[in-house]
Amino acid sequence: MEQNEQPVFGIEKLYVKDLSVEVPNAPEIFLEREQPQVEIQLNTGGRAVGDGVYEVVLTVTVTAKMPEKTVFLVEVGQAGIFRIQNVPEEQLEPLIAVACPNILFPYAREAVSDAVSRAGFQPIVLQPVNFEGMYMQRLQEQAGAPAEVPIQ
């Protein structure tokens, strides 16, 4: 195999593509003593931006609510530009859906924690995420759950 045919996977750039913080009920919300319910949503997406160059965005949305009130909403779009070349077609999607988000996640976690604390709240520490499991689940959903065959 020639040098230019070797598989290439590299990080070109990491950056925050989107950062949004909302505290719609400030300052009154800071007087509340009740613990809010925290909901975390993750989404990943990727697109080609050049020959063998892909942008992958990991979006983390954290919403803290009390009954009938939003405490805060933080959304971080942590992005990266990745060079992926000479990789078999069947390996490209798993790289974009699993490997790239695994690289982006620590940066997104730090951005979320920082944004929440700068908004005046205790930092949120995001637990590690199984992106491979999320990818496999999405593949199963796209393929449709296999019909169960009764055992006789």
From Swiss-Prot:
Keywords: Chaperone, Cytoplasm, Protein transport, Translocation, Transport. GO terms for biological process: protein folding; protein tetramerization; protein transport. Homotetramer, a dimer of dimers. One homotetramer interacts with 1 SecA dimer. Its main location: cytoplasm. It is found in: Cytoplasm. One of its GO terms (molecular function) is unfolded protein binding. This is Protein-export protein SecB. One of the proteins required for the normal export of preproteins out of the cell cytoplasm. It is a molecular chaperone that binds to a subset of precursor proteins, maintaining them in a translocation-competent state. It also specifically binds to its receptor SecA. GO terms for cellular component: cytoplasm. The keyword Cell membrane does not apply. InterPro entries: SecB, SecB-like_sf. It comes from Dechloromonas aromatica (strain RCB). Belongs to the SecB family.
